[in-house]
């Protein structure tokens, strides 16, 4: 009978440990990084070869932020920091959000002339963290 009691006690203890381990949420497994450095954006001029054909390949790099398709107030508390890009061309009244990690912005069918591209690194709710503008002249198609 003593062996049976020990076996049942071991099974009960194992069940309690397994239950508490599986009840731990994913959020509690993430340790936030205190005092994260500010995001940094590096933008290069468009590649000259494609630009001669009216296509702008604008290389960029973001540090201290992961570009991801997430949004909303809860995502502001994710660590390491997440966000996305807002791209505005020639001061037009609209922009688009870029959630990819291609590190290149591609603009096609650019008309001849001067162009300006504003690239903003934003938090999950669209608040601007840093930005750069690249200007260039397109020979057009």
Which role fits each region the language model picked out?
Residues 95, 123-131:
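Short acidic/polar inter-strand loop motif in beta-rich domains
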Residues 61-77:
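Short amphipathic, basic-aromatic surface patches that mediate peripheral association
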């Amino acid at each position: 009978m003593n062996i049976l009691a020990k076996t049942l006690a071991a099974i009960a203890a194992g069940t309690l440990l397994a239950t508490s381990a599986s009840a731990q949420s994913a959020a509690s497994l993430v340790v936030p990084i205190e005092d994260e450095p500010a995001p940094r954006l590096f933008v290069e001029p468009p590649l000259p070869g494609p630009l001669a054909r009216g296509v702008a390949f604008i290389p960029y790099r973001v540090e201290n932020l992961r570009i991801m398709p997430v949004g909303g107030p809860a995502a502001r508390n994710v660590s390491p920091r997440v966000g996305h890009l807002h791209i505005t061309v020639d001061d037009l009244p609209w922009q688009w959000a870029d959630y990819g990690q291609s590190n290149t912005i591609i603009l096609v069918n650019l008309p001849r002339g001067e162009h300006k591209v504003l690239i903003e690194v934003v938090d999950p709710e669209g608040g601007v963290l840093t930005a750069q503008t690249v200007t260039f002249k397109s020979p057009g198609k």
